[in-house]
Regions:
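N-terminal TM1-TM2 helical hairpin plus the immediately adjacent luminal interfacial "cap"
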Residues: 12, 16-113, 117-118, 124, ...
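Hydrophobic core segments of alpha-helical transmembrane domains in multi-pass membrane proteins
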Residues: 83-88, 136-145, 161, 191-209
Length: 215
């Protein structure tokens, strides 16, 4: 992991202009546009945006755009919670970009997107079933863990009332993440257990070595 981490650091130092500045603004805008298309076309059923989701069988048939477009599928069908989640992850992502620089943040986000695709492929090969991912849940979770590591004492209002530090929310999400993995393993669902682990490998590459540097 340390060698990969050092390679990332060198790349970012040599190519500081790599990537798309304010990337999260485009991700948020894409989610809003897709949501509006759903609303105006009354395409609210589960199959309406099937051409955007990350599906193993479809990708292997040449529909390579799905490797990227799945992150634009809204994670919530309710406008209120969609706007709240988009604002929250825009805040997290833009803060990480200011902290790391555009190059490193773009690498982190893009690697999360691609690792999720790799995880879906491996899970499908192991299980013999075609996995589908709609929305950027794992990418967002990876961003959240990175933010909580860098800014553990930052407070947010849980349910708009209760002040909670990011590190405690990260511990809770980490516990739920581990529970889901263990539950899949106990059920013999090896693909379902590997998918989230592979999807969050960018956290291990970008963040975990910093734990040792800080120790």
């Amino acid at each position: 992991m340390k060698k990969l981490y050092d390679a990332v650091q060198r790349f970012c130092a040599r190519h500081p202009r790599f990537g798309i500045p304010n990337l999260m603004l485009y991700i948020v805008a894409g989610n809003v546009i897709v949501y509006l298309l759903m609303m105006f076309t009354q395409a609210n059923d589960a199959n309406a945006l099937a051409f955007l989701t990350l599906n193993t069988s479809a990708v292997l048939k040449g529909e390579l755009w799905r490797i990227i477009t799945y992150v634009f599928v809204p994670t919530s069908s309710g406008i209120f919670w969609l706007l709240i989640s988009l604002y929250f992850y825009y805040w997290i992502g833009s803060t990480l970009e200011r902290q790391w620089g555009t190059a490193k943040f773009n690498l982190y986000y893009i690697s999360g997107v691609l690792l999720t695709a790799v995880g879906v492929l491996i899970a499908s090969l192991i299980s013999g079933q075609s996995y589908t991912v709609a929305g950027s849940y794992y990418v967002n979770l990876s961003m959240f863990f990175a933010f909580a590591f860098l800014f553990p004492d930052t407070q947010v209002l849980l349910f708009f009332i209760i002040p909670v530090k990011m590190k405690w929310l990260a511990y809770l999400d980490g516990a739920l993440f581990a529970y889901d993995v263990v539950r899949c393993l106990m059920a013999g669902n090896w693909g379902g257990a590997l998918l989230p682990i592979i999807a969050l490998l960018n956290f291990a590459v970008f963040i975990w070595p910093e734990v040792h540097y800080m120790a």
